[in-house]
Amino acid sequence: ENFFKEIERAGQRIRDAIISAAPAVETLAQAQKIIKGGD
């Protein structure tokens, strides 16, 4: 039972990291587009 709680906690941590990283990833993608000569 404890084992599953650990997995759940790790999963939440990973999800939080992805959620907080998403805006940065989007910003990087936009910056690359601009550098490559997009709009």
UniProtKB/Swiss-Prot annotation:
UniProt entry tagged with the keyword Translocase: no
Key words of the record: Antibiotic, Antimicrobial, Fungicide, Immunity, Innate immunity, Secreted
Record-linked InterPro entries: Cecropin (IPR000875)
GO cellular component: extracellular space
Key word Cell cycle present: no
Subcellular localization: Secreted
Record Pfam families: Cecropin
Domain of life (superkingdom): Eukaryota
Tissue specificity field: Hemolymph.
Induction (record text): By bacterial infection.
One example of a Gene Ontology biological process annotation: defense response to fungus
Transmembrane segment boundaries: none
Family as reported in the entry's similarity comment: Belongs to the cecropin family.
Function: Cecropins have lytic and antibacterial activity against several Gram-positive and Gram-negative bacteria. Has antibacterial activity against the Gram-positive bacteria M.luteus (MIC=34.4 uM), L.monocytogenes (MIC=34.4 uM), and S.lutea (MIC=34.4 uM), and the Gram-negative bacterium E.coli D31 (MIC=8.6 uM). Lacks antibacterial activity against the Gram-positive bacterium B.circulans, and the Gram-negative bacteria E.coli ATCC 25922 and S.typhimurium.
Descriptive protein name: Cecropin-D-like peptide
Species: Galleria mellonella (Greater wax moth)
Source species taxonomy: Eukaryota, Metazoa, Ecdysozoa, Arthropoda, Hexapoda
